């Protein structure tokens, strides 16, 4: 009987441990799936719309600068750096999901020409690895190796993100040619204001959904507010929910209008996009150019020598 109870206790403990582990996994996965740039990957087949707009701007409403630096020309089957710069004031703090203030994170999406892709680790030089740091890049889609995403990562450490890119070789990829190609980039700093389902985050302004008198402001136990508005025209009560972390601009008894801001704007981040051009250069063309320049230099040297020889002959004839 005692042995049976022992086995029963062990079975219950194992079941409880599995349940706890599964719960932790689900919570962890959910927090990861809610991170940039997963939203874009889950909801858009291509991050760049036909208009040229990058879809990250649908959630990050403020417009901020972003810059990209790439070489003017690259040779086939070589590795080069694409440096994305996401500048912002490092002293700024953003409202986190729990309502507290914290440092800003950054993220980026890099849209390369077809055939260009993330360089394999064995092709990246030690100097470039040092610039990359501990960043882990991923493809936007398994079949879209030319679109790379990164983030969220700490902005104070990675306001400049170095992408190691492998240029294609037209000799092995017939879909690639020696041409000038565009590169597009999008970069954000800080959290977004809108979730993909259209709901607001706590990193944006909340406006009144009705006009009237504020009859009550209830501070919720876990943070945030419930604001009760009495419509002056019909006496109907409307309750606006304000999430935690936001600063109220209104008070009880105040008369407000429809869409009047109830909170200040906490957003200190924003999204920006840019572009650059890169030329995939034919090595034979480079060799031909070098040969041409060399022949021009040699021709100039021969002309100078010939001129000096002619001057010597003239000088000797005059002396004679």
UniProtKB/Swiss-Prot annotation:
Gene3D superfamilies: 2.40.50.100, Cytochrome f large domain, Single helix bin
Chief location category: plastid
InterPro entries cross-referenced by the UniProt entry: Cyt-f_TM, Cyt_f, Cyt_f_lg_dom, Cyt_f_lg_dom_sf, Rudment_hybrid_motif
Binding site for heme: 36, 56, 59-60
SUPFAM superfamilies: Cytochrome f subunit of the cytochrome b6f complex, transmembrane anchor, Cytochrome f, large domain, Rudiment single hybrid motif
Record bears the keyword Coiled coil: no
GO biological process: photosynthesis
GO molecular function per UniProt: electron transfer activity; heme binding; iron ion binding
UniProt membrane topology term: Single-pass membrane protein
Cofactor field: heme
Annotated localization: Plastid, Chloroplast thylakoid membrane
Recorded family membership: Belongs to the cytochrome f family.
Protein name: Cytochrome f
């Amino acid at each position: 009987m005692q042995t049976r109870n022992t086995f029963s206790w062990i079975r219950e403990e194992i079941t409880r441990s599995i349940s706890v582990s599964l719960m932790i996994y689900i919570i962890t996965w959910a927090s990861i799936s809610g991170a940039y740039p997963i939203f874009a990957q889950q909801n858009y087949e291509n991050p760049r719309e036909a208009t040229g707009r990058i879809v990250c701007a649908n959630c990050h409403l403020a417009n901020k600068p972003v810059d990209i630096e790439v070489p003017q020309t690259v040779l086939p089957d070589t590795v080069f750096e694409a440096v994305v710069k996401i500048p912002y004031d490092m002293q700024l703090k953003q409202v986190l999901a729990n309502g507290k203030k914290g440092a800003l994170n950054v993220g980026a999406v890099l849209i390369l020409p077809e055939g260009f892709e993330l360089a394999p680790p064995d092709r990246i030089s030690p100097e470039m690895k040092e610039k990359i740091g501990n960043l882990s890049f991923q493809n936007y889609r398994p079949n879209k190796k030319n679109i790379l995403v990164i983030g969220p990562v700490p902005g104070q450490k990675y306001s400049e993100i170095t992408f190691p890119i492998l240029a294609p070789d037209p000799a092995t990829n017939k879909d690639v040619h020696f041409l000038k190609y565009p590169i597009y980039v999008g970069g954000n700093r800080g959290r977004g204001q809108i979730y993909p389902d259209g709901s607001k985050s706590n990193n944006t302004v909340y406006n009144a959904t009705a006009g009237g008198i504020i009859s009550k402001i209830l501070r919720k136990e876990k943070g945030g507010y419930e604001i009760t508005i009495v419509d002056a025209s019909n006496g109907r009560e409307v309750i606006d929910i304000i999430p935690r972390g936001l600063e109220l601009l209104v008070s009880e008894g105040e008369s407000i209008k429809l869409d009047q801001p109830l909170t200040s704007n906490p957003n200190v981040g924003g999204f920006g996009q840019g572009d650059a051009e890169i030329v995939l250069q034919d090595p034979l063309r480079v060799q031909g150019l070098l040969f041409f320049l060399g022949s021009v230099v040699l021709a100039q040297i021969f002309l100078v020598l010939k001129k000096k020889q002619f001057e010597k002959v003239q000088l000797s004839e005059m002396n004679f």
